[in-house]
């Protein structure tokens, strides 16, 4: 695994630790992340082949530049599984292990953007969860460019419990669907009240932002959840 990480440098290497016929074996996988120098995404075909060969004991990946400690995005992704993560810095030749223990939620502000792990919908779901509202997650395509070209929000918001607002005044907890460099509505933001929103643009840190002219002109739909009255007193 260390040699694979050195060969991949400056990109992140990734793979799996397998138990095959009673022996541990490292199974290298292709990193299909759009920005492999900053993150990793295991090729699903490689993952499936690994499952056929043996039992998956751990996820392995490298941090070519930073210390081999789990990032916030690593902790979130690891919490979705049940196996430890081994992280190596190939230049320092140092390792760390992260054992997930239940669901991990990063701080809402200043999150690193990682597709399907820490993106605009993840941020919205985590905010609603802190407010006492559990929203379902949706499977995204492997490549965020596919989502930009064919966004899913328009066909999913009703099944998630939201209704379209017509002329109602925006209230805390409303969800805004926006078009950011896309032919459709590919971005979402939570309205916090007082002219502010919480959102996470691609390749930026999550932030509290002013709902100014640019974001307003990008907004295509304004939504309100069916349980908003019970939680925030609006409906």
Task: Give the location of each predicted region.
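Active-site nucleophilic cysteine motif
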Residues: 114-131
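Glycine- and charge-enriched low-complexity intrinsically disordered segments
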Residues: 209-235
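Generic beta-sheet signal
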Residues: 86-88, 200, 225
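Surface-exposed patches in mature extracellular/periplasmic domains of secreted proteins
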Residues: 135-140
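Conserved beta-strand-loop surface patch within small alpha/beta domains used
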Residues: 1-58, 64-103
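...with weaker cross-activation on analogous glycine-rich loops/strands in unrelated enzymes
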Residues: 141-212
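Second-shell loop/turn segments in exported
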Residues: 108-114
